[in-house]
């Protein structure tokens, strides 16, 4: 339905008809999408529909078929409120309070990073490490628990510990574990990286902050304003967390254990170098679906020279089910 001029009163209708026309969902979506477009939102129509579905309790498909639906004044007011929030560039996932990741719908909080589809590359790499076995998993900087919970869901014999410095993030991760029925195999605790953790672990995973401090202000508003800064800020060069991991992880890995870490664009060689200095042997780099180098795997160093790092020729395959917007 287009914005148009309405036309209701010109056809002889009275004030009641005009008021009803103003509450037709299609018209509200047109106006909402226009406002979001002006605000610089990348996909204004899609986001307006998602928000309408949230307010009205409708699936995205049902919203597409509901242009002629007349909403109540209360529903129109609620839709106006969430459109106004999205106008500020608050992400839809933050407004809804949840985000699709792997094949789950996970709760978010003010202290958790909004999980990205690219991070599913890290999950796929971890699952390959644990192929055919259980294992003990440590997730450093767990946030919403998305990585650890995805690994545990697909490796029923595994158990895991997630650490985050933010108590609010730990509470969200616990909530997600309970919602997925994984609370018996997933423990979460507040901690400063692995400072108070005892190993050994068969797999250690981390998606640490890796944005250089000076670059954060230039990120999309959805990220710079609404993701917690401590989940983004990797220090002056974006590599401070990897220095911590390089110092702490070797002592926590089992003899055949593996560290899998996510990193930012152009950071692969620097991250590999830091891990080598810490006593690890980086052996493989995984690419995400867009073809960007995204994930590095390293193991405890054996005697002798370091072998060359293998780089995937192709991006990793999609995970178990599409990532939901």
Swiss-Prot record:
Keyword vocabulary terms for this entry: Methyltransferase, S-adenosyl-L-methionine, Transferase
Annotated spans, Disordered: 306-325
Say which family it is in: Belongs to the protein N5-glutamine methyltransferase family. PrmC subfamily.
Enzyme category, top tier: transferase
Task: Give the enzyme's EC designation.
Answer: 2.1.1.297
Give yes or no: UniProt keyword Transmembrane: no
Annotated organism of origin: Rhodospirillum rubrum (strain ATCC 11170 / ATH 1.1.1 / DSM 467 / LMG 4362 / NCIMB 8255 / S1)
Kindly provide the name given to this protein in its UniProt entry: Release factor glutamine methyltransferase
- Binding positions for S-adenosyl-L-methionine per the UniProt entry: 141-145, 164, 193, 207
